[in-house]
Amino acid sequence: MPKLKTHRGLAKRIKISGSGKYLRKKAGKSHLLSGKSRKRKRNLKKTVIVDSTNVKAVKKLLPYL
């Protein structure tokens, strides 16, 4: 069976925590920021854990991470 390829776009966007959970950044923090409140921009900075419904898809795209 051939080797599986890692999805490079996703590999650049996701990190794995020490406990094995997948971490990602929130969307919406790159431009058009003047219309967003200070609180909203502050909350967009945070790193979040990938939702359990998406973990299966992430594992399929990142077979060796």
Swiss-Prot record:
Keywords carried by this UniProt record: Ribonucleoprotein, Ribosomal protein
A single GO CC term for this protein reads: large ribosomal subunit
Molecular functions (GO terms): structural constituent of ribosome
Taxonomic superkingdom: Bacteria
Task: Please indicate if the UniProt record lists Ribonucleoprotein as a keyword.
Answer: yes
Q: Which InterPro entries has this protein been placed in?
A: Ribosomal_bL35, Ribosomal_bL35-like, Ribosomal_bL35_CS, Ribosomal_bL35_sf
Q: Which GO terms describe its biological process?
A: translation
Q: Which residues form the signal peptide?
A: none
Matching NCBIfam families, A to Z?
rpmI_bact
Q: Which family does it belong to?
A: Belongs to the bacterial ribosomal protein bL35 family.
What protein name does the entry list? Large ribosomal subunit protein bL35
State the organism of origin: Caldicellulosiruptor saccharolyticus (strain ATCC 43494 / DSM 8903 / Tp8T 6331)
| Name of the encoding gene | rpmI
